[in-house]
């Protein structure tokens, strides 16, 4: 599509004439047909990525379930050894994020995503056979290395198939599958613990063995269901969509943000995306949000145990807060896409997270502390797909999108490192230092979002007056 045509269509989309990108791209399909196309993309792309991501979340966070199922005693995880094992995962997970989205383009989504998923399944299986704590250290490093490419690659791939105001719901559904499965991972772990003694293996070993096998099976299935980029789908004439339907998707993306066509990879152009300050603002927000979400994911069974619940109750009570998170996530994503807003959601959820943290750390009633867990799990996890969509709504260009997906999730890895350290065993049962740290993180989210909102509003005003062109495309406006 010519650049002038793209500019004209973007101007229609953002210029206030009442039309959106779907309408601009609707040359040959009825609204009902367009919905059917989107549903097929949702089923094949979003659902597949979501199922694979859910097993990723379970595999990286099942350490806490194994810890209270006997692993700490068998491997002598005294002092800071447990936190070290949690931390080691995030070192490679963070460092290997940047090249992931480049590899995705070069290798292709099907072999790349299915291949790394199968690989970390093998590593997870190996967790069940270690006999000394330090032998698990290299396995955690390998697990982080293989999982590093998955999340940013999924964000990037999904963003190439949907227009800006379709992404929040898709990211939420993608992440919701993972969160829901993660919430019920305690139930799964409790069930696997009942295999204690089978073949002379302790219950915690069966958690790793069975979940590793499940991961490898899902990876094999995913190889046959993952879809390629829309421009490659046209070239390969996949049965997933016809060439005519793929062309409609490409035109829709071009009408929305003018970056449907992929440029030849240029390292300088890719790296130059890092000169945009807002890219690092998005990354910092994601870092601070993930600090809270990972801290809860890794330590919630242990925290509940410290509240006085039994081992079984601590495993089972993990699930309800995550069910609440899923409900809140879908409601908020619908609101965010319909009203084309993200910043107020981020600020509201961060505020709710702070309130929940205060209840967890500064009240004595078990009921109020558990209610605080509900608030923290729901609000913090709702903010994750919101910041993904916030970033995706405010950038343009395929390689910039690839760079930003990697930096976003890379900083999420840094948040994971922080989250693995904030709740320390010696701070039980109130974990005050961890509470202070996560309250600070959410306060910083509010500040950064407020600063970005002021900047975006000023830029939009200048663009309306014809004084600047945002993101190199006339008619483009920032989402606030």
Model-derived regions, located:
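Extracellular/periplasmic helix-loop-helix junction of adjacent transmembrane segments
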Residues: 64-96
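C-terminal transmembrane helical hairpin of 12-TM major facilitator-type secondary transporters
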Residues: 339-387
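Conserved MFS/SLC helix-loop-helix module at the cytosolic interface between two early adjacent transmembrane helices
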Residues: 94-134
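Residue-level signature of mid-helix packing/kink "hotspots" within the transmembrane helices
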Residues: 61, 90-98, 148, 182-183, ...
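Helix-to-loop junctions at the C-terminal end of transmembrane segments
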Residues: 95-108, 327-341
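Cytosolic juxtamembrane N-terminal segment immediately preceding the first transmembrane helix
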Residues: 2-63, 73
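Central mid-sequence intracellular linker of multi-pass
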Residues: 164-178, 197-270, 433, 438-439, ...
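Extracytoplasmic gate region of multi-pass secondary transporters
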Residues: 64-65, 265-334, 384, 388, ...
């Amino acid at each position: 599509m010519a650049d002038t045509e793209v500019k004209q269509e973007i101007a229609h989309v953002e210029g206030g004439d009442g039309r959106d990108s779907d309408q601009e791209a609707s040359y040959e399909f009825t609204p009902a047909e367009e919905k059917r196309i989107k549903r097929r993309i949702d089923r094949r792309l979003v659902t597949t990525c979501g199922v694979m991501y859910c097993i990723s979340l379970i595999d990286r966070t099942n350490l806490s379930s194994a810890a209270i199922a006997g692993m700490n005693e068998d491997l002598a995880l005294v002092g800071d050894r447990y936190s070290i094992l949690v931390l080691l995962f995030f070192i490679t997970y963070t460092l290997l994020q940047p090249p992931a989205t480049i590899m995705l383009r070069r290798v292709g989504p099907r072999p790349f995503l299915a291949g790394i998923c199968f690989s970390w399944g093998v590593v997870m299986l190996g967790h069940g056979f270690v006999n000394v704590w330090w032998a698990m250290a290299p396995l955690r490093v390998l697990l982080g290395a293989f999982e590093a490419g998955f999340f940013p690659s999924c964000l990037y791939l999904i963003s190439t198939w949907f227009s800006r105001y379709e992404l929040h719901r898709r990211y939420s559904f993608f992440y919701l599958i993972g969160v829901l499965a993660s919430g019920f991972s305690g139930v799964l772990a409790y069930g696997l613990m009942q295999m204690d003694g089978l073949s002379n293996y302790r219950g915690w070993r069966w958690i790793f063995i069975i979940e590793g096998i499940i991961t490898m099976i899902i990876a094999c299935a995913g190889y046959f269901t993952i879809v390629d980029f829309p421009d490659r789908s046209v070239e390969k004439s996949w049965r997933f969509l016809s060439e005519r339907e793929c062309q409609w998707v490409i035109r829709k993306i071009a009408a929305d943000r003018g970056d449907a066509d992929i440029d030849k990879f240029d390292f300088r152009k890719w790296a130059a995306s890092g000169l945009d300050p807002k890219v690092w603002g998005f990354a910092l927000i994601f870092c601070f949000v993930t600090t809270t979400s990972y801290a809860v994911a890794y330590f919630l069974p242990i925290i509940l145990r410290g509240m006085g619940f039994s081992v079984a109750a601590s495993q089972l009570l993990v699930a309800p807060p995550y069910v609440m998170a899923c409900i809140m996530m879908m409601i908020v994503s619908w609101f965010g896409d319909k009203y084309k807003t993200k910043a107020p959601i981020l600020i509201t959820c961060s505020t709710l997270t702070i309130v929940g943290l205060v209840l967890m750390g500064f009240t004595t009633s078990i009921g109020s502390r558990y209610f605080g867990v509900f608030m923290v799990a729901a609000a913090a996890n709702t903010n994750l797909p919101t910041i993904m969509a916030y970033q995706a709504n405010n950038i343009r260009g395929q390689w910039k999108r690839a760079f930003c997906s990697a930096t976003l999730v890379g900083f999420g890895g840094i948040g994971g490192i922080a989250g693995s350290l904030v709740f320390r065993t010696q701070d039980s049962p109130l974990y005050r230092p961890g509470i202070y740290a996560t309250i600070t993180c959410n306060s910083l989210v509010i500040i950064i979002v407020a600063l970005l909102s002021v900047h975006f509003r000023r830029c939009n005003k200048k663009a309306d007056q014809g004084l600047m062109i945002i993101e190199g495309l006339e008619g483009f406006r920032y989402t606030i």
